[in-house]
UniProtKB/Swiss-Prot annotation:
It comes from the Bacteria. One of its GO terms (cellular component) is cytosol. PANTHER family: S-ADENOSYL-L-METHIONINE-DEPENDENT METHYLTRANSFERASES SUPERFAMILY PROTEIN. Specifically methylates the N7 position of guanine in position 527 of 16S rRNA. Pfam families: GidB (PF02527). This is Ribosomal RNA small subunit methyltransferase G. It comes from Actinobacillus succinogenes (strain ATCC 55618 / DSM 22257 / CCUG 43843 / 130Z). It is found in: Cytoplasm. Keywords: Cytoplasm, Methyltransferase, rRNA processing, S-adenosyl-L-methionine, Transferase. Belongs to the methyltransferase superfamily. RNA methyltransferase RsmG family. Its EC number is 2.1.1.170.
Amino acid sequence: MANNLEQILREKLEILLQSTALSLSSQQKQQLVKLVLLLNKWNKAYNLTSVRDPQEMLVKHILDSLVVSPYLRGERFIDVGTGPGLPGLPLAIINPDKKFVLLDSLGKRMSFIRNAVRELELTNVEPVLSRVEEYIPDHKFDGVLSRAFASLKDMTDWCSHLPVNNGLFYALKGQYNEDEIKQLDEKFTIQQVIKLDVPELQGKRHLILIK
């Protein structure tokens, strides 16, 4: 059954990628499928995501993360409130030249991420178990990523110590919410709002770049 599921996921991933401008190596595709298989396996015991169907995971978790990749500027990124490593793990897989710190305060999520990093042999990921406001990095980041983590105001307030001077906040959101934008501290400005196209995903997705 596992081999059959793996084949189904490989074929599904190929179809999904054809609807994007992303170009992935066969190894990267293999790693992404393996990540879904790991998430599916661990999810049964640890309840890491409400998405139960592995094919849905490809759309709602993997592709939803990958479409951010073309907009990443810089080399060092932190994914705050990463949950089961989203969007950090998929982005790390297809950006081996960039470094990613994956931060979350829940132990079971970090156990999964550490296991995934080992299984996928990722050398550009550092899992960190911590609350974001208590985390003091040795070096600041070119980009601070968040997906379903907090409001824009909370994200920028809690994470203001993390980016370099010209660093960006990358907030993955569903609806583009004007009220959320208005609540931002005046020291932050919206650089760009990008409407993301995620193959087979129902509902709107936006990437909001904040400086």
